[in-house]
A protein has these predicted regions:
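Structural preference for solvent-exposed beta-strand-turn elements
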Residues: 1-371
Length: 371
C-alpha cells in the first residue's frame, strides 16, 4: 500500500473511528484501526469492538492499493506533532511507514486478513434527522441511563417514533429523563440503543458538520450515516421499563418555581461539600419553608447551609435529594427560564421541568432523610 493524504483530514478520520475501539487483550487486532486503500482515491478507516463499528471514508492519492491494521494511539500522537500538510503512508515488509518532508517513522502492523469482516450498513429506508437535533436529544437524555452493564435493559437510551413524534428516554431506576419532539416521519419504531453506542455517536455527530444524519433500524442493529462516516451497532433486545407507567404514577400537591441560574449556583456550592459524603454521596437536605428553599449538606470536616427565594404552592416539605442528579438535568436547561419542581412528600419522587417546556421532563427518587 502506498497513499498520500491530507494529514489533518486523516487525523480527523482516525479520531472518528477510534471511538468504537476498546482494549481487547484476547483479540488484540480489534484494539486496532483497519485501513484500506482502494481504487480512484478511496480510503477506508474502521474501528470496532464487535458490537459497535464506525467506518469512515476519505479521499487521497492512492499510488498502490492495500490494507493495514495498526495500533492507533502512537500514530495519532505522532501525527499531532507533524506540521506537513500532506503525508505518505506506505506498508512495506510488515511495517506502516509514515513519510513527511523531513522524517520517516515506522509502526508495527497486524495481518489485515485476520481483521473481522463487518458490513458497512443495513438494508431498508432511512429516517433523516437533523444532525444537531439528534446530538442534542441524545446528549440531554443519556445521563439518565445506567452506566453499569449488569442490567443491559437500562444500560441504553430508548428511542421511539410514533404519530410523527420522537421520544427519547433513559432511566437507571433511580431517575428517569424524557424528551420528545416533532419528526417528519410517518412510520413507527421502538429501539434501545446501548449507552456506549450513544456516547460514540454523539462524539461523531459533534465532530462532523453535515446538516443531516440518516438512521436505519432492523431487528438487532441500528445504522447511522453522517456524510462519509457510518456507525453500526447492535441493539438491546431486552424489554425497556414501562416509562409511561412511571410518569403517570408521579403525583404532586406542592410546586416550586425557582430561577434556574441562581439555583444551579446553589447546587454547585453544596456539591463541593457533599460529593465525598461517606454516609450518602451527593446527598443534601432540601427544606421548603414559606417561600424559601433551604439546602444543607455535610462532609467529613465541613458543612454548608444555603437558601434561595422561590415561588411556592402548597405546604412546606423537607426532602433529601442527590445534588449531582439534579445538576445532571438542570445543566441542559435555559438558565434564563425558571425551573419547576413538583413534590408530594419526603418519600415520593419529584418531577422537574423547564417552565416553558413540557416536553423535557425529569423524575428523581428521594434519598432517605438523615438526622
Amino acid at each position: 500500500m502506498n497513499i498520500k493524504v491530507d494529514r489533518q483530514e486523516f487525523l480527523k478520520t482516525l479520531r472518528i473511528v477510534e471511538k468504537a475501539i476498546a482494549e481487547n487483550k484476547i483479540r488484540p487486532i480489534i484494539s486496532c484501526v483497519y485501513l484500506e486503500a482502494q481504487e480512484e482515491g478511496k480510503i477506508i478507516l474502521r474501528g470496532t469492538n464487535l458490537e459497535l463499528t464506525i467506518t469512515s471514508f476519505m479521499d487521497g492519492e492512492v499510488q498502490q492499493k492495500g490494507k493495514a491494521v495498526f495500533s492507533y494511539q502512537l500514530v495519532e500522537e505522532y501525527l499531532k506533532e507533524i506540521t506537513d500538510k500532506e503525508i505518505n503512508l506506505v506498508v512495506k515488509e510488515g511495517l506502516l511507514i509514515i513519510e513527511t518532508s523531513d522524517s520517516s517513522s515506522e509502526f508495527s502492523v497486524m495481518e489485515p486478513e485476520e481483521y473481522p469482516r463487518i458490513k458497512d450498513s443495513i438494508e431498508g429506508t432511512g429516517i433523516v434527522f437533523s444532525r444537531e437535533k439528534l446530538a442534542e436529544m441524545l446528549e440531554k437524555t443519556k445521563f439518565g441511563a445506567s452506566s453499569s452493564t449488569d442490567n443491559l435493559s437500562i444500560n441504553c437510551v430508548r428511542v421511539e417514533i410514533e404519530d410523527k413524534r420522537i421520544k427519547v428516554v433513559a432511566t437507571d431506576t433511580y431517575r428517569l429523563v424524557y424528551l420528545e419532539d416533532d419528526i417528519e416521519y410517518e412510520g413507527s419504531l421502538k429501539v434501545s440503543i446501548p449507552l456506549t453506542t450513544v456516547e460514540a455517536l454523539i462524539k461523531t455527530l459533534r465532530t462532523l458538520d453535515e446538516e443531516n444524519v440518516e438512521f436505519k433500524f432492523e431487528e438487532n442493529q441500528v445504522f447511522f450515516r453522517v456524510g462519509s462516516s457510518m456507525v453500526l451497532s447492535r441493539v438491546i433486545d431486552l424489554p425497556f421499563p414501562d416509562y409511561n407507567g412511571i410518569m403517570k404514577s408521579v403525583s404532586h400537591n406542592k410546586k416550586i418555581s425557582v430561577n434556574t441560574e441562581e439555583f444551579t449556583k446553589v447546587l454547585k456550592r453544596v456539591q463541593i461539600f457533599v460529593k465525598n459524603n461517606s454516609e450518602s454521596k451527593y446527598s443534601a437536605i432540601f427544606s421548603l419553608e414559606a417561600g424559601s428553599f433551604y439546602v444543607s449538606g455535610v462532609s467529613e470536616t465541613a458543612k454548608v447551609n444555603e437558601h434561595i427565594e422561590v415561588e411556592q404552592e402548597g405546604d412546606d416539605v423537607k426532602i433529601s435529594l442527590n445534588v449531582k442528579f439534579l445538576l445532571d438535568y438542570i445543566q441542559h436547561l435555559d438558565k434564563n427560564d425558571r425551573l419547576i419542581i413538583d413534590l408530594l412528600t419526603s418519600n415520593s419522587a419529584i418531577q422537574l421541568k423547564n417552565s416553558k417546556d413540557e416536553k423535557y421532563l425529569y423524575i428523581a427518587m428521594p434519598l432517605a432523610l438523615r438526622d
